[in-house]
Amino acid sequence: MTLPFAEWLPKQRWYAGRSRVLASVKEASATPLGEELDLVLVDVEYTDGSSERYQVMVGWGDGPLPEYSTIASIGTADDGRDGYDALYDPRATRHLLGLVDTSATAGDVTFEKEPGVELPLEAWPRVFDAEQSNTSVIFDEDAILKLFRRVTCGVNPDIELNRVLGRAGNPHVARLLGSLQSADDSGPCSLGMVTEYAANSAEGWAMATASARDLFADAEMRADEVGGDFQGESYRLGEAVASVHRTLAEELGTGPAPFPLDAVLARVRTAAAAVPELQQFVPAITARFEALTGAEVVVQRVHGDLHLGQVLRTPEAWLLIDFEGEPGQPLDERRMPDSPLRDVAGVLRSYEYAAYQLLVDQDDDEHLAARAREWVDRNRAAFCDGYTNVAGADPREQGALLSAYELDKAVYEAAYEARHRPGWLRIPLRSITRLVG
């Protein structure tokens, strides 16, 4: 069985090789999961020497739902059968959920249901269209199956930390319901996970930007007077993040570590080489980091890539999602303990983005810039107050360290924006100016 993956893969939104030239595509394995359903692992090599492994659930039956026929149809195999992406076939995804429910084994693939959970086997599945790097299938209002498109062997931190937090009863994550993995000579390889679905939820980024937009729309009102004031939600978000940190510390432990001076200085050098606008700040940034030579930090497992787009507000609570860590980093590095200040800094940076991204075309408007700063300061303070209420320690009391983690994040952002959104580069540069000033 050979399908034309070389033509189909580059058209998928989760394909990560668009900036590289494809050299070869070959099927590494095909595991039958049913009469007309195979789990296929596809190895991709690029001309620059890099490689990736992708996961595709291939269906051979009547085909996907008609509205998805274009994106899901892979093509005709060498045996004459037509293959398609089975995640767009409700019968196939219901079958996958059933395999999780029975903790089934198929070849080298194992499915595992979490203890004491019930899966919505009769629910109607639909693909979540907004997903980028993975593909998720929602089962009514009850569960969501996330299939990892790029397969990397090792313990997946998203599954690992959701399992720890769920079994500990932390209320600020969507409970893990099950998972699936394969095994090869390198060890276990996580393939997907099933969690509770956060029905009737709103993304933190959307809520925050709406609040800032409301403030800018009424030139006479203060941040605490507009209808979309976000301060209370920021306080509760701080409490939620601190709660997750506390549970992870209790369940997985903490320890001392030196401030990662070499790593942050290396990121500065790399970013400055790619972003000319950053070079004038390098001496001041370097001095800020080198002032922490010999500093010791308390490290533990953390989210690792926390920002307002990684949190959901349900009617009951804030939820933290996507514990996969910083994208692009090796799996073992994403599982390394880090300072909780890394997550705090990520949220604080995100407040600046929520406000200032609305002003990228009006950067010379001093009045709007002042109102943006008012909104940012108000919500940063509320978040830290909420965090302190649960953690028992104020992250602002570690001012030099917290600023260093913010600065490290802003340097990363500058490199990202210069490459992908040059019009937004002024946002991290504004923050760097403030942090080193």
Swiss-Prot record:
From the UniProt record, which GO molecular function terms apply?
ATP binding; kinase activity
Record carries keyword Nucleotide-binding: yes
Q: How does activity depend on pH?
A: Optimum pH is 8.5.
Give the first-level EC class, as a single word. Answer: transferase
- Per the entry, what induces it? Constitutively expressed.
Pathway, according to UniProt?
Answer: Glycan biosynthesis; glycogen biosynthesis
Q: Which domain of life is it from?
A: Bacteria
How its function is modulated: the record gives:
Inhibited by EDTA.
Please give the UniProt note on temperature dependence for this protein.
Answer: Optimum temperature is 55 degrees Celsius. The enzyme activity decreases rapidly at temperatures above 60 degrees Celsius.
**InterPro entries attached here?**
Kinase-like_dom_sf (IPR011009), Mak_N_cap (IPR040999)
UniProt cross-references to SUPFAM superfamilies, sorted A to Z? Protein kinase-like (PK-like)
**ATP-binding keyword on record:** yes
User: Which regions span the lipid bilayer?
Assistant: none
Which transformation does this protein catalyse, written as a reaction? Answer: D-maltose + ATP = alpha-maltose 1-phosphate + ADP + H(+)
Q: What is its EC number?
A: 2.7.1.175
Entry's Gene Ontology BP terms: carbohydrate phosphorylation; glycogen biosynthetic process; trehalose biosynthetic process
Going by the UniProt record, its keywords in alphabetical order are: ATP-binding, Carbohydrate metabolism, Glycogen biosynthesis, Glycogen metabolism, Kinase, Nucleotide-binding, Transferase
Additional facts recorded: In the presence of 20 mM MgCl(2), the addition of CaCl(2), CoCl(2), FeSO(4), MnCl(2), BaCl(2) or CuCl(2) at a concentration of 1 mM to the enzyme assay led to a decrease of activity between 20% (FeSO(4)) and 83% (CoCl(2)).
Subunit structure, interactors included: Monomer.
The function of this protein is: Catalyzes the ATP-dependent phosphorylation of maltose to maltose 1-phosphate. Only maltose acts effectively as phosphoryl-group acceptor, but maltotriose, maltotetraose, maltopentaose, and maltohexaose show a weak potential to replace maltose. ATP is not replaceable as phosphoryl-group donor.
Family of this protein: Belongs to the aminoglycoside phosphotransferase family.
Name-wise, this protein is Maltokinase
Write down the species: Actinoplanes missouriensis
